[in-house]
Amino acid sequence: MRIERVDDTTVKLFITYSDIEARGFSREDLWTNRKRGEEFFWSMMDEINEEEDFVVEGPLWIQVHAFEKGVEVTISKSKNEDMMNMSDDDATDQFDEQVQELLAQTLEGEDQLEELFEQRTKEKEAQGSKRQKSSARKNTRTIVVKFNDLEDVINYAYHSNPITTEFEDLLYMVDGTYYYAVHFDSHVDQEVINDSYSQLLEFAYPTDRTEVYLNDYAKIIMSHNVTAQVRRYFPETTE
């Protein structure tokens, strides 16, 4: 973690995601677990106080900027004399509230983080049941493709006319790459499957990753009518 003293009332710090994980906090827990989130930010404040003698007195104003490799946080003490007369308990309560506002932001500034992570949590719980259902899928046919980035996923959701909305589909992510799997029932005509695959290949690429591999090593981002969910959470990209 890099700490910069801006002036008597303001400090700025930059911490990488790898540094966050090295301190025993996962990125997902940090943004969704209130107790763990507060524990992390208070530990940051203790470290700032040790290095810069920046004692928490009264209300603090917190501003966060997310970048590809980490998060930059600016922390300022209030200069308002009336606010400085707050009790220690009130100041602590306000800081906790500000931390919660901070935790409510996504790493890209999206407002729907909590809802997305709740969905992902449900999907993780469903992974076990999906494995139990694997035997029932012996009569289904699955296609798996990969997207180079999120923009390609969004373009597919907006510019294709997918028939896949009628079938179970899953969007995975592993090593920064998005994988999309679609399960076709045994009664589906092969021509329909070929047409769906052709549409996918306008935005995605073939892959040798299997669904077994993805279930073991990837994270499920969305499931069940993925394209509709992508359109709900993300605006259409422009050229």
UniProtKB/Swiss-Prot annotation:
Pfam families: MecA (PF05389). Disulfide bonds: none annotated. Residues 118-128 have a biased composition (Basic and acidic residues). The N-terminal domain probably binds unfolded/aggregated proteins; the C-terminal domain interacts with ClpC. Enables the recognition and targeting of unfolded and aggregated proteins to the ClpC protease or to other proteins involved in proteolysis. Homodimer. This is Adapter protein MecA.
